[in-house]
Swiss-Prot record:
Record NCBIfam families: bL25_bact_ctc, PRK05618.1-2
SUPFAM superfamilies, per the entry: Ribosomal protein L25-like
Example of a GO MF term: structural constituent of ribosome
Protein family according to the UniProt entry: Belongs to the bacterial ribosomal protein bL25 family. CTC subfamily.
Function in brief: This is one of the proteins that binds to the 5S RNA in the ribosome where it forms part of the central protuberance.
Spans traversing the lipid bilayer: none
UniProt protein name: Large ribosomal subunit protein bL25
UniProt entry tagged with the keyword Oxidoreductase: no
Complex formation: Part of the 50S ribosomal subunit; part of the 5S rRNA/L5/L18/L25 subcomplex. Contacts the 5S rRNA. Binds to the 5S rRNA independently of L5 and L18.
């Protein structure tokens, strides 16, 4: 179930670069609400509160109830821009969510049971190939993350997108379900050890074969020691 947060916003009647700079000087961040077949609405938000929400993580997958001068607008952040030098927010785009709206989001991948995976116990390393999963869901069903159980993975094995169980009401938007999510990478020297172990029986076989004739050579010598049978009388 999606987490719904609240933010307070103020209508921004003036648009343009000059008006946006004036908002930032006043400690506010310009933003816009669009979508749901309605005209866009220009707004501004308190800078400090917005920074805290962005730094908290999962900002782009969090449904927000925007309180715009007393009127609630259910939205989801679709994009935000940061100052390239000082790293503070300079603009935010919010998508208006109509009733039953379905949207595409990218959510993080969380791993489960990595400590108990056989490959990890044997010295392997968990390699996360895909850090986020693209999904399609109703606004109220957006998961905060997708959980992947890797408790059965051994060295050299992988977990694919098709192996993941999705929450109810959530669909994948990936072109292929065989996308690799996680692999267990072997430790240093593992392949050499495997080759050496595989070569040991092969090397032992010729040695065993070489000993066989020596053992068989004792048989004639034993036969030579046997007394000759007495000749029959006529």
């Amino acid at each position: 179930m999606a987490t719904v947060k609240e933010l307070k916003a103020t209508a921004r009647p003036s648009v343009g670069k000059g008006a946006a700079r004036a908002e930032r000087r006043a400690g506010r961040v310009p933003a816009v609400i669009y979508g749901d077949n309605k005209p866009p609405v220009t707004i501004s938000l308190e800078d400090r509160e917005l920074r805290l929400r962005i730094l908290a993580g999962r900002f782009l997958t969090t449904v927000v109830d925007l309180d715009l001068d007393g009127t609630k607008h259910r939205v989801i952040p679709r994009d935000f821009h940061l100052d390239p030098v000082r790293d503070f927010p300079v603009h935010v785009d919010f998508l208006r969510l109509g009733e039953g709206a379905t949207i595409r989001v990218s959510v993080p991948l969380h791993l489960k049971n990595s400590e108990t995976a056989p490959g990890v116990k044997r010295g392997g390393t968990v390699n996360i190939v895909t850090h986020t999963v693209d999904l399609e869901a109703e606004a109220d069903s957006i998961p905060q993350f997708i959980e992947a159980d890797i408790g059965t993975l051994d060295i050299g094995t992988s977990l694919h997108l098709s192996d993941v169980v999705l929450p109810k009401g959530v669909k994948l938007v990936a072109a292929r379900e065989d996308v690799t999510l996680v692999t267990i990478v072997p430790p240093s020297g593992f392949n050499e050890e495997q080759k050496a172990a595989a070569g040991a029986p092969a090397a032992a076989a010729p040695a065993a074969a070489a000993k066989a004739p020596a053992a068989g050579a004792k048989a004639p010598a034993a036969a030579a020691k046997a007394p000759a049978a007495p000749a029959k009388k006529k």
